[in-house]
Amino acid sequence: MKKLELKCRFFEISIPYKEETAFWHKQNVELKIEYQEGNSIGNFSIRKDNVEPEMIREEWKKLKDETESFMLGMMYLGNKKVCSKEDELLYSNNGEKFSIRNEMDIEAIITRSKGEEFNYAYLELPSLVCSGEIQSSPIPLPHKMPYVPLNLKRYILTITQAERLDDYCENYEAEQLKLWFLILEELESNKKDSEYHNIKCARDFVSHDVCDRKDPIEFLKIKLPSAVYTESGHEKARFCRDDKLHIALVSKYQSKARCRARKLVKQEIEKYGGNV
């Protein structure tokens, strides 16, 4: 069988899983997770069968895209720091196995398939070290392969950018609120909804040195009256990071925005045939 196989290693899989191996047969994908001194490495393999030598370049690109879609799916599921290293591209033809490093190797395989001789160098892989952290309470690996269409990549990157701020001891919920709202502003269809309105007002409150627009001022007069003051006859508000009441308000609407944004992104993923 003429087979093309891409092998990668995924690092910093922060969610612990009960199983060490998953087979997603529909996609010809295998994932094996190794735990080493509190760190995790995901050995990932994706295969395409019946690939003629002339089609290696095209199918390689497809396998790389499928691998990136898998990584985005894992990121959505909570592995916010996961990253990959492409280790090896293998091509099998009539019992022979070739490691592909570059265009010359592909040309060598094509030439060899025509019965001509061509010098071919096999690839030797360097050893890699992972430096992630493992949490407690293992969960099952997904029943279906996590998959996010690449046209939705920007939403996953925004989600992970926001969720990585959870890892700092400082409070960055104001910054998280702004990031979540980027998703809401684009994907939310019901912008007249009261919760969306309140999230937007909270976002406006933390986004400006001095907030003086009517909607956020009216919102704050109800939710946080102490933040509103009058200057030169105009009502204004200023976000203070050291005020516990201000932080509590932002935390409340950051949480609401997070839930809403993740739900909207999941709907988009399913709409375009993905799975998380």
Identify the role of each PLM range:
Residues 1-175, 263, 271-272:
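Charged, non-catalytic interaction/linker regions at domain boundaries
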